[in-house]
């Protein structure tokens, strides 16, 4: 028997930049018991992320940018080392991530490989993130990167082993980066 869900109330609390909803629903459990829940759900749309890697140089491209949510949560300068990422808006995931790669890292990558789709915070955020990797070369640099006009992004080309060490030391705290770096490690692509 699958779970039965009945929406009792769905109220929009904010529709400023993204949509924050307060949803009251009844959930009928497998044993027939009905439980009422009240949850806030943040709908920011779906996104995509990519890790660029170079086997010959044994390097990866990451970015560093200010993230207000991390600053609010105690990150002293609010800057986070991440993989290149962006919201899909109305684009297909691969189209989105190619645009983001050029805007944020400056690299116009060739073949991109979709790995998987993951919910990163399913308890309250609707976002489904599409994960990609792509090999890059210096010849693919189209511009300096750094993002669009309202972004202040540092492009970081880092030795792969150093990036893995940065996870251990806590310098990399972004879940997307951790997942993609560890994928690259276990896949053997950098061996």
From Swiss-Prot:
- Write down the InterPro entries for this protein, in alphabetical order: NDP_pyrophosphatase (IPR004385), NUDIX_hydrolase-like_dom_sf (IPR015797), NUDIX_hydrolase_dom (IPR000086)
Q: What EC number(s) does the entry state?
A: 3.6.1.-
Q: Which reaction does it catalyse?
A: GDP-alpha-D-mannose + H2O = alpha-D-mannose 1-phosphate + GMP + 2 H(+)
Residue ranges of domain Nudix hydrolase in the record: 43-180
Please give the organism: Enterobacter sp. (strain 638)
| Major enzyme class | hydrolase
Q: What does this protein do?
A: Nucleoside diphosphate sugar hydrolase that hydrolyzes GDP-mannose as its preferred substrate, yielding GMP and mannose-1-phosphate.
The GO annotation for biological process reads:
nucleoside phosphate metabolic process; ribose phosphate metabolic process
Q: Where does Mg(2+) 1 bind?
A: 85, 104
Q: Name one GO molecular function term.
A: hydrolase activity, acting on acid anhydrides, in phosphorus-containing anhydrides
Give one Pfam family, short name only. Answer: NUDIX
The protein, known as: GDP-mannose pyrophosphatase
Write the gene name.
nudK
**Listed CDD domains:** NUDIX_GDPMK (cd24157)
> How does the annotation summarize its subunit structure?
Homodimer.
> Annotated motif Nudix box: location in the chain?
86-106
Supply the domain comment. In the dimer, the N-terminal domains are swapped between the two monomers, such that residues of both chains contribute to the active site.
Question: Where, by residue number, does Mg(2+) 2 bind?
Answer: 100, 104, 151
């Amino acid at each position: 028997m699958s779970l039965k869900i009945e929406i009792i109330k769905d109220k929009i609390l904010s529709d400023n930049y993204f949509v924050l909803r307060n949803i009251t629903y009844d959930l009928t459990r497998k044993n027939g018991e009905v439980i009422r829940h009240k949850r806030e759900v943040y709908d920011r749309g779906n996104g995509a992320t990519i890790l660029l890697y170079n086997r010959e140089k044994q390097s990866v491209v990451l970015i560093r940018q200010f993230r207000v949510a991390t600053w609010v949560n105690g990150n002293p300068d609010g800057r986070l080392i991440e993989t290149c990422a962006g919201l899909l808006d109305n684009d297909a995931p691969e189209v989105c991530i190619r645009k983001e790669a050029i805007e944020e890292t400056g690299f116009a990558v060739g073949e991109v490989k979709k790995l998987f789709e993951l919910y990163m915070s399913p308890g309250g955020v609707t976002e489904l993130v599409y994960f990609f990797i792509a090999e890059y070369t210096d010849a693919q640099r189209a511009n300096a990167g750094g993002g669009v006009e309202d972004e202040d992004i540092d492009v970081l080309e880092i030795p792969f082993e150093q990036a893995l060490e940065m996870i251990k030391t806590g310098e990399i705290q972004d879940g997307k980066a951790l997942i993609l770096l560890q994928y690259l490690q276990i896949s053997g692509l950098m061996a």
